[in-house]
Curated annotation (Swiss-Prot):
Substrate binds at N12, W13, K14, G172, S211, G232, G233. This is Triosephosphate isomerase. The keyword Cytoplasm applies. The gene is tpiA. One of its GO terms (molecular function) is triose-phosphate isomerase activity. Belongs to the triosephosphate isomerase family. It catalyses: D-glyceraldehyde 3-phosphate = dihydroxyacetone phosphate. It is an enzyme of class 5 (isomerase). GO terms for biological process: gluconeogenesis; glyceraldehyde-3-phosphate biosynthetic process; glycerol catabolic process; glycolytic process. CDD domains: TIM.
Length: 249
């Protein structure tokens, strides 16, 4: 982390949470005073409006978990970036491995969704990451570099893009790469961002995600070119999420 990149701790609730979960959200919002990091919770779409209203005036931001590339139209079951913004979201996670795998979303569709997020005034958090087979073959940096190259449109700036590195084999498994492994991949991401966007790359935040917990957060967040975390399961519990946010140096 550097002075020009304010840390971001974002919680991805995935397909979890009912309206009763507002109690956890309120606990998080109440516990953020004095923290140096920006914080965000990305709940299911059904909760965005209620959550955004509940935390209005606090430091906690609300984001979405996906959006359709189109602004509107005959896309049953989909949500547009404009709908997310209208509901109170300020950002959206795009290209998560669970979307890439479960819905066969490739880099081209992720790129289109990033453009949609920009169109609606949302901050896209673009996820990239390798499989265990790719990691064991020594291809992690190459895979992630390719994903950044193909998933992120031209014109990205320090205030319009966040990248989240989530090694697929570490998501929800309790396994994490070493801090050296994380530093290597984050360094590769920083390099391709600099190659594409010049000086703007110095301000683009790169988050780490994949089994981030209170007991490993400090080490991960102290790693070179790690500017925050995209937190999965641990973000569902206010105490755990706050502990991770407090681990920012």
């Amino acid at each position: 982390m550097t002075a020009e990149r304010r840390p971001l701790i974002a919680g991805n609730w995935k397909m979890n949470g009912l309206r009763a979960a507002k109690s956890e959200l309120r606990t998080v919002a109440a516990g953020l005073a004095g923290l140096s990091a920006e914080t965000m919770i990305c709940p299911p779409f059904t909760l965005i409006g209620a959550f955004a209203a509940d935390v209005a005036g606090t430091q906690l931001m609300i984001g979405g978990q996906d959006c359709h590339p189109a602004e509107s139209g005959a896309h049953t079951g989909d949500i547009s970036a404009e709908m997310l913004r209208d509901a109170g979201a300020v950002a959206v996670i795009l290209g998560h491995s669970e979307r890439r795998i479960d819905h066969q979303e490739g880099d081209a569709i992720v790129k289109a969704k990033v453009k949609a997020a920009w169109r609606a005034g949302l901050l896209p958090v673009v996820c990239v990451g390798e499989t265990l087979v790719e990691r064991d073959a020594g291809e992690a940096a190459a895979v992630v570099t390719r994903q950044v190259r193909q998933s992120v449109p031209e014109g990205a700036t320090a205030v319009s893009l966040v990248i989240a590195y989530e090694p697929i084999w570490a998501i929800g498994t309790g396994r994490t790469p070493t801090t050296d492994d994380v530093a290597e991949v984050h360094g590769a991401i920083r390099h391709i961002l600099a190659e594409r966007f010049g000086a703007e790359a110095n301000g683009i935040r790169i988050l780490y995600g994949g089994s981030v917990k209170p007991d490993n957060a400090a080490a991960l967040l102290a790693t070179a070119n790690v500017d925050g975390a995209l937190v999965g399961g641990a973000s569902l519990k206010a105490a755990d999420f706050l502990a991770i946010a407090r681990a920012v140096g």
